[in-house]
Amino acid sequence: MANTLEQLKAFTTIVADTGDIEAIKRYQPEDATTNPSLILKASEIPEYSALIENAIDWAKSQSDVLAQQIEDAGDKLAVNIGLEILKIVPGRISTEVDARLSFDKEGSIAKAHKLIKLYQEAGIDKSRILIKLASTWEGICAAKQLEQEGINCNLTLLFSFAQARACAEAGVYLISPFVGRILDWYKKDTGLEYSATDDPGVVSVTSIYDYYKRHGFNTVVMGASFRNTGEIIELAGCDRLTIGPALLEELQNSTTPIVQKLLPATEVVAPEAEMTEAQFRWEFNEDPMAVEKLAEGIRNFAIDQGKLEVMLKEKLSS
């Protein structure tokens, strides 16, 4: 019998949630996703030292101002790691906009343009890039404009139906609804343990997937942030799943049979009228889990971006 990972690939496109090139080679995913935390982790891998030095040299060539050099080096390093990953995966790389721009539509658009330009200067077409943005109202509005320009986006830190609906209505290419972080919140809030079937994160992604398919939205649903393989197996059939190396290894070493759980709708009905900003903010605010986890996620990505910049500053100043 094929291992569980290979069985899963029959129903779902598998994406590696890592910046570790050796892990990506091992599990042969279609795409890969990165974020500031993963870039920070990858920057500590000795084999990546040349990518860091290249980013430092490039940043120094662009500006004499240290603050600008730090920003440029961070952007260039994220792209350098993306370029290495694109040598391995046949599909796309997701590269994230600075989390500190999560409430700045114009700043997010400008950063996306810069990242795309860096990839294009390295010979990579924008069709192989997904720009990752936090699923704030401003991030969704930025994505709507970028999509109209032909720049595809991956809306991340998505914890609520309101965020998912707004993304679909904006014509976003792909969303990353989080599973494990939703489970974390509910376990802490209720003190209960959940089976994979009852897992609140699994229930959330399933309802989003069903809504998209029932209303004919083309936005890709890519479940993310998993705590165990049970969650992954319950979402077999989801358009894509982005999975970290530890769980990819567990799936590869397992022969648990997989059954497709998520199925496309048999008929499509017209969606409701589009949400207004006021509706979005109210519906999102009504979900304390989503409010807390989005804010926490943005803060934590910003903290890791800051740690990365401390390292880059030391190298730029030496």
UniProtKB/Swiss-Prot annotation:
The record's subcellular locations are: Cytoplasm
Catalytic activities: D-sedoheptulose 7-phosphate + D-glyceraldehyde 3-phosphate = D-erythrose 4-phosphate + beta-D-fructose 6-phosphate
Active site residues per record: 132 (schiff-base intermediate with substrate)
Please provide one cellular component term from the Gene Ontology annotations of this protein.
Answer: cytosol
Q: Which GO terms describe its biological process?
A: carbohydrate metabolic process; pentose-phosphate shunt
Q: Which GO terms describe its molecular function?
A: transaldolase activity
Q: What is its main location?
A: cytoplasm
> Does the record bear Cytoplasm in its keywords?
yes
Q: Which family does it belong to?
A: Belongs to the transaldolase family. Type 1 subfamily.
Name of this chain's protein: Transaldolase
What is the native source organism of this protein? Shewanella pealeana (strain ATCC 700345 / ANG-SQ1)
- Lineage of the species this protein comes from: Bacteria, Pseudomonadati, Pseudomonadota, Gammaproteobacteria, Alteromonadales
Identify the gene encoding this protein: tal
